[in-house]
């Protein structure tokens, strides 16, 4: 759905192109300081928009992390769609993480909702309710609903989500990204429990985020 181009997130290509072109222009004009700054920006953009292939685990009854980052919150919170209290796992992404987001499970996108908001630091609790965010609900073959929320942060003000209601996603499949660092919240369906700890590093599409209770 959201396939990379030459190992890079497609939404990053225009930004990389602008910095690369600026580097060339400044070099031709013999403006070394600006050429150096543009070159460093190009290198940073290449690193930021990298989108490596991942192999997801195949065992049943699990959900994988939708984002690279660090687990910044575990607990209960109201599902932004239904209002039900659910177990929630929050993953904070900094500017050095891969920022492409992946589906935690195989299922059908049953709902997509964009919610405008503010741009507080994404590590704050109020970011879940006050910040700009995009919500998708992925319903698996057993009817379990996973609510995944992309949250814009203090720096990241650009949420990308081409997924739409009716689309089918595979576990670990790319479905969007948030530019320049932010946060992903996953509201687990009843019967699933977190399989990660506070402060644990996660890898999108690989780290087992939650497991179904026996």
Swiss-Prot record:
It holds the Pfam family PS_Dcarbxylase. Its EC number is 4.1.1.65. GO terms for biological process: phosphatidylethanolamine biosynthetic process. GO terms for molecular function: phosphatidylserine decarboxylase activity. It is found in: Cell membrane. One of its GO terms (cellular component) is plasma membrane. It catalyses: a 1,2-diacyl-sn-glycero-3-phospho-L-serine + H(+) = a 1,2-diacyl-sn-glycero-3-phosphoethanolamine + CO2. Its main location: membrane. The record marks 181-182 as: Cleavage (non-hydrolytic). Pathway: Phospholipid metabolism; phosphatidylethanolamine biosynthesis; phosphatidylethanolamine from CDP-diacylglycerol: step 2/2. It is a peripheral membrane protein. InterPro entries: PS_Dcarbxylase, PSD-A. Its cofactor is pyruvate. Heterodimer of a large membrane-associated beta subunit and a small pyruvoyl-containing alpha subunit. This is Phosphatidylserine decarboxylase proenzyme. The lineage of its organism: Bacteria, Pseudomonadati, Thermodesulfobacteriota, Desulfovibrionia, Desulfovibrionales.
């Amino acid at each position: 759905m959201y396939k990379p181009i030459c190992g890079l997130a497609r939404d990053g290509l225009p930004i990389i192109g602008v910095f690369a072109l600026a580097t060339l222009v400044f070099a031709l004009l013999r403006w070394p300081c600006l050429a150096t700054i543009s070159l460093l920006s190009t290198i940073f953009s290449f690193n930021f928009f990298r989108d490596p292939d991942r192999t997801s685990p195949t065992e049943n009854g699990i959900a994988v992390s939708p984002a690279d980052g660090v687990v910044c919150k575990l607990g209960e919170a109201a599902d932004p769609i239904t209002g039900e209290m659910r177990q929630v796992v929050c993953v904070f992404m900094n500017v050095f993480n891969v920022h492409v987001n992946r589906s935690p499970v195989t299922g059908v996108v049953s709902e997509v909702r964009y919610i405008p908001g503010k741009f507080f630091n994404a590590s704050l609790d109020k970011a879940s309710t006050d910040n700009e965010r995009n919500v998708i609900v992925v319903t698996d073959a057993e009817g379990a609903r996973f609510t995944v929320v992309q949250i814009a942060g203090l720096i990241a003000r650009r949420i990308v989500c081409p997924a739409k209601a009716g689309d089918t996603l595979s576990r670990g499949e790319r479905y969007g990204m948030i530019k320049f660092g932010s946060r992903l919240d996953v509201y687990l369906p009843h019967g699933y429990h977190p399989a990660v700890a506070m402060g644990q590093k996660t890898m999108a599409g690989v780290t087992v985020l939650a497991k179904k209770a026996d």
